[in-house]
Amino acid sequence: MKELELKYGCNPNQKPARVFVDEGDLPITVLNGRPGYINLLDALNGWQLVKELKEATGLPAATSFKHVSPAGAAIGKPLSDTLKQIYFTDGVELSPLACAYARARGADRMSSFGDFISLSDECDEATALLIKKEVSDGVIAPAFSNKALEILKAKKNGNYCVIQIDPAYVPPATEVKQVFGVKFEQGHNFIKIDESCLSNIVTKNKNLSEDEKHNLIIALITLKYTQSNSVCYVKDGQAIGIGAGQQSRVHCTRLAGQKADNWWLRQSPKVLGLQFVDGIKRADRDNAIDVYIGEEYEDVLAEGSWQRIFKVKPEVFTREEKKEWLAKNTDVALGSDAFFPFGDNIERAHKSGVTVIAQPGGSVRDDQVIETADKYNMVMCFNGIRLFHH
């Protein structure tokens, strides 16, 4: 098939809409549902991300996309008991691929609501059962087991979007887009992210473990398919905070850092001990936790409000308690899609437990940035690779 007609483009008034190729066939087959324009942008970007994560790490990978940027991305490492609890997988048998999706979805559950999922490997039953329970628009994978396909086809009253992609497909060397009637042409970004990108360590501390290398590679590959400007915090094989599409680099670092902080706060005893009313939906629980750990916590603790959410009124999670818990988060990796212009980015990263950094370098203030990293005994690599994506 050379062409797929779509219901509409980015918005309902943008008709007609289609995706097509000039030569050969489309690399995708729609097995169920009817994907939208943005769904396919998410699917094709997400597929490239997980394919490269699998190639770089050797482990199954998954990503959760919203509006053409990942909300989460991860490889299939086993989950701790705490992560199983906050990812709603307690008592569930998980395959490596299911672990990858649980991590990708669980990093920023608020942003992943209604996501489009990309999987590096054949979707198995365990992964399909996880997807079944989440609010999601669709999934793309190189294959689906019969049982997984049966489960997914029943989702959303039979309208859940399921796309199979040819894993052997290689895009043309040149890509073209059109804006306001003007065509833009550039070479496809085939740059490979691997350990060679981490060889130029510019800080005094040059000790980079294999796990830290993996985390930095995950950060950089994630950034390659994130709308710029972007930075990505990674811990234990998964993105824990992605700051996308900000005009200011330090605002990326703050946004992603706050997301990483929220991920860590969700694992605190105070949050794990919250007693929710029976029958509360996952989305309502996620929203309540997000408010509870934030500055507007009074909104869920107010009289008449907390009773709809909690069995017992929670104690305030004080600023001092949160600061004490956040100080326990360490061994976080940070990647940036372009250079850090000032040391303030490093200062903010330090607050979220960052110990290793990969960035292109090239700022006129590189010396100041390196000095700030040295102050915290961080390891920082200059890879000379800009990863802008639009």
Question: Predicted segments — roles?
Answer:
Residues 56-64, 163-165, 228-235, 265-276, ...:
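Flexible, glycine/charged-enriched surface loops at secondary-structure junctions
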Residues 69, 123, 235-238, 246, ...:
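Active-site-proximal loop/turn and secondary-structure-junction residues that shape catalytic pockets
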Residues 1-197, 212-230:
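Active-site loops and adjacent core secondary-structure elements that bind or stabilize anionic groups
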Residues 71-109, 240-339:
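Glycine- and Gly-Pro-enriched alpha-helical subdomains that act as flexible
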Residues 22-34, 107-113, 187-206, 284-306, ...:
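Gly-rich Lys/Arg/Thr-decorated short loops/hinges at beta-loop-alpha junctions or inter-strand turns
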Residues 60-61, 66-71, 75, 230, ...:
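Glycine-rich phosphate/pyrophosphate-binding loops
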Residues 52, 225, 262-266, 351:
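Conserved helix-loop functional segments at active or binding sites
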Residues 115, 119-120, 133-163, 168-170, ...:
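C-terminal binding/interaction regions
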